[in-house]
Curated annotation (Swiss-Prot):
<feature type="compositionally biased region" description="Acidic residues">
    <location>
        <begin position="690"/>
        <end position="707"/>
    </location>
</feature>
<keyword id="KW-0228">DNA excision</keyword>
<dbReference type="InterPro" id="IPR003583">
    <property type="entry name" value="Hlx-hairpin-Hlx_DNA-bd_motif"/>
</dbReference>
<dbReference type="Pfam" id="PF08459">
    <property type="entry name" value="UvrC_RNaseH_dom"/>
</dbReference>
<dbReference type="Pfam" id="PF12826">
    <property type="entry name" value="HHH_2"/>
</dbReference>
<dbReference type="InterPro" id="IPR041663">
    <property type="entry name" value="DisA/LigA_HHH"/>
</dbReference>
<dbReference type="InterPro" id="IPR001943">
    <property type="entry name" value="UVR_dom"/>
</dbReference>
<keyword id="KW-0234">DNA repair</keyword>
<dbReference type="Pfam" id="PF22920">
    <property type="entry name" value="UvrC_RNaseH"/>
</dbReference>
<dbReference type="InterPro" id="IPR010994">
    <property type="entry name" value="RuvA_2-like"/>
</dbReference>
<keyword id="KW-0267">Excision nuclease</keyword>
<dbReference type="InterPro" id="IPR000305">
    <property type="entry name" value="GIY-YIG_endonuc"/>
</dbReference>
<comment type="similarity">
    <text>Belongs to the UvrC family.</text>
</comment>
<dbReference type="GO" id="GO:0005737">
    <property type="term" value="C:cytoplasm"/>
</dbReference>
<keyword id="KW-0963">Cytoplasm</keyword>
<feature type="compositionally biased region" description="Low complexity">
    <location>
        <begin position="660"/>
        <end position="689"/>
    </location>
</feature>
<comment type="function">
    <text>The UvrABC repair system catalyzes the recognition and processing of DNA lesions. UvrC both incises the 5' and 3' sides of the lesion. The N-terminal half is responsible for the 3' incision and the C-terminal half is responsible for the 5' incision.</text>
</comment>
Length: 707
């Protein structure tokens, strides 16, 4: 240990605060908190503790500097540690998945007819709104939202659509919504449905069942049979939900149970969420390289986890976390009610901790098995493509264009077989005019590799979505910049990046694989573009319609490598390629929508580029601009009454341009005149899922700015 570090250890204050450990390059590798900085930090270097952890044994070699921040209280230290971990993302700290991986249901109770909305857990909580969750998967929130909307009949349309709808949507026709947007619905009656939904989402189904049964009996006694039937359906749905839930505690309390399982530096923290005594959710959180004590890891985890979800009355933990009292104060302050951290040693609550620990162990085993399969897939890609090393950092690039217009490129990244969205990039093609995919790809790869040279980091493998021509364009870009695409025999440590082209499967000729050309009724041959053999027979064509396997083109090889169908290497590469295609298409559609928006607004006098962008940000769609009132238009940034009146008059003049519905706005509209429609419940469910998917759409990280 150098003299400067020894001096800092000697001068540490015996006060609460946070400490930042830095490596010799100045990067923060660990952030911790303490009620006494002197005692906590010195304990890592105390040979009398008998601590044999690998990280502590390497502290002398790893640690380059130490920084401390004194706080006024232990509670401030808890809050500061949370912020420092999010800011520096230290290597040895617990880091939860990105906040946008967690989703919640929001109910804005300030609205007279509130609805459930899907929101990211990281969004700032609004006063007067109630939140349920978080849900760790889109499928779980889909199931919950579908059931609530089906049986409690809350509206699904946005506030903007609610304010401007002229006729009820299909949900009204199939008795899934009372259509408060059009018809007069008693606020008290709707509020009753909201309260029922809240009780269901909070896990208080027992109270809800009793109340529903009483209201059903009352409606039947009053000869209101339709209302009684609706309440019966709600009651049956809630009772079916109760049958699926296991009661673990007789006291019906709300608590989370934390389990922890460790092997070496890797560990899993399991959270069992219990509401009204029933297990509602279970989430496993795996972490690597966690050399610090379990009590520090647990304290950091609880502070981060409950930042975006409400803490229950009790949190059962397997051991007392660092600064447990201050942590409980922070959680209570966030929640607005008291939160207790308990470490039971015997009884039913101790049994719950054992259940959580066994679940954590099971999650640990599943996590490591997944890691093994991922390592095997990377090794299989290395063997199949004759690579010089395992492709731990892979990127894939695709071009999207429409008749040469609005050409864009996309780049997606995978590290260790998992999406690395921080390195996703979007490119506007700048130097190519017309339809020239090869030149566009050359430009995109040139820009990517130029940035990589500036950063001093090259990926292991770049996959090009395309065949030999696209691969050659990318190789030419690498050659122009002097980027090696194979390891140097004389300098094996020199950086290089390998490139391959992944071509999609296609219809091919041949008796064993089917034929790409089919014969019609008059003997005319045509390209086969039919979905399946049944469609071919219906249209009078004869074809087996088999597809070729996926093909990978390698530099310097004439024939492509044909990957085994359903193999791990094909699945990994196809997943990377499909993600690049999705990312490019999404960006291209966004640009088309913006261009269409701008072109219509160009006809409005007095509306410049700045106000066009403000309208797009505020409303998001031309249809919503057209439906807006002058008062709503005047609320847009940079707009006054005069500009608002000009826009409103433009869209409401007799020869106004027709505007197509350019995005979903909740459920589909009912037939004119309120008559029945042919929309099925499946179509309605799809509309609801479309709204969820839109809310859960990945936010494109770090887009490449256009010139």
């Amino acid at each position: 240990m150098d003299a400067n570090l020894r001096r800092k250890l000697d001068e540490l204050p015996a006060e609460p605060g946070c400490y930042l450990m830095k490596d010799r390059a100045g990067e923060v590798v660990y952030v911790g908190k303490a009620s006494s900085l002197r005692s906590r930090v010195r304990s890592y270097f105390d040979p009398g503790r008998g601590d044999q952890r690998a990280f502590v044994a390497l502290l002398d070699e790893l640690l380059g500097d130490l920084e401390v921040i004194v706080t006024r209280s232990e509670k401030e230290a808890v809050l500061l540690e949370n912020e420092l971990i999010k800011k520096h993302r230290p290597r040895f700290n617990v880091r939860l998945r990105d906040d946008k991986d967690f989703i919640v249901l929001k109910l804005d109770e300030r609205h007279p007819y509130p609805r459930l909305e899907v929101r990211r857990a990281r969004e700032k909580r609004q006063p007067g709104a109630r939140y349920f969750g978080p849900y760790s998967s889109a499928s779980s929130i889909r199931e919950t939202l579908r059931m609530v909307n089906r049986h409690f009949q809350l509206r699904t349309c946005s506030d903007h659509v609610f304010d401007h709808r002229k006729r009820p949507c299909i949900l009204y026709q199939i008795h899934r919504c009372p259509a408060p947007c059009v018809y007069e619905v008693a606020a008290e009656e709707y509020r009753q449905s909201v309260e029922d939904a809240v009780e269901f989402l909070e896990g208080r189904e027992g109270e809800l069942v009793e109340r529903l049964r009483g209201r059903m009996d009352g409606a039947a006694a009053g000869l209101r049979f339709e209302e009684a039937a609706r309440l019966r359906d709600q009651l049956q749905a809630v009772e079916r939900s109760l049958e699926k839930q296991r009661v673990l505690m007789a006291d019906r309390g709300d608590r989370d149970v934390i389990g922890l399982y460790r092997e070496g530096p890797d560990l899993v923290v399991q959270v069992l969420s219990m509401r009204a005594g029933k297990l509602q959710d279970a989430q496993a959180h795996p972490f690597r390289e966690q050399e610090f004590p379990d009590e520090e890891i647990l304290s950091s985890f609880l502070s981060l986890y409950y930042e975006h979800t409400d803490a229950p009355d009790e949190i059962l933990v397997p051991l007392e976390p660092v600064q447990a009292e201050a942590l409980a104060d922070v959680l209570s302050e966030r929640r607005g009610r008291r939160v207790r951290l308990l470490t039971p040693q015997r009884g039913a609550k101790a049994d719950l901790l054992d259940v959580a620990r066994r679940n954590a162990e099971q999650g640990f085993r599943a996590w490591h098995e997944h890691d093994e399969r991922r390592e095997q897939a990377l090794a299989a890609v290395e063997r199949a493509l004759h690579l010089a090393r395992p492709p731990r950092w892979m990127e894939c690039y695709d071009i999207s264009t429409f008749q040469g217009a609005l050409a864009v490129g996309s780049g997606v990244s995978m590290k260790d077989g998992e999406p690395d969205k921080a390195n996703y990039r979007r490119y506007k093609v700048k130097a190519v005019a017309g339809q020239d995919d090869f030149a566009m790809l050359h430009e995109v790869i040139t820009r990517r590799l130029r940035r990589a040279l500036g950063e001093g980091q090259l990926p292991d493998l770049i996959v090009i979505d395309g065949g030999k021509g696209q691969l050659n364009a990318a190789l030419a870009a690498a050659k122009d910049l002097g980027v090696p695409t194979r390891p140097s025999p004389g300098n094996p440590d020199a950086p290089f990046v390998e490139l391959v082209g992944l071509a999609k499967s296609r219809l091919v000729d041949g008796p064993s694989l089917g034929t790409a050309r089919v014969v019609g009724r008059r003997g005319r041959r045509a390209e086969a573009r039919l979905a399946d053999a049944a469609e071919a027979a219906e249209k009078g064509f004869v074809s087996e319609l088999a597809r070729s396997p996926e093909r990978v083109f390698l530099p310097g090889r004439k024939d492509p490598v044909v990957l085994r169908q359903n193999s791990a290497e094909l699945f990994l590469l196809a997943r990377l390629r499909d993600e690049a295609h999705r990312f490019a298409i999404t960006f291209h559609r966004k640009l088309r929508r913006e261009r269409n928006f701008q072109s219509v607004l160009e006809e409005i006098p007095g509306i410049g580029e700045g106000r066009k962008r403000a309208l797009l940000r505020h409303f998001g769609a031309l249809r919503r601009v057209r439906e807006a009132t002058p008062e709503e238009l005047a609320q847009v940034e940079g707009f006054g009454p005069r500009q608002a009146a000009a826009v409103h008059a433009f869209f409401h003049r007799p020869d106004a341009p027709p505007i197509a519905a350019d995005e979903p706005s909740g459920a589909p509209a009912a037939a004119p005149g309120g008559g029945p429609t042919d929309a099925s419940p499946e179509a309605v469910a799809a509309a609801t899922e479309a709204e969820i998917d839109a809310a859960l759409a990945d936010e494109d990280a770090s887009p490449e700015p256009a010139a």
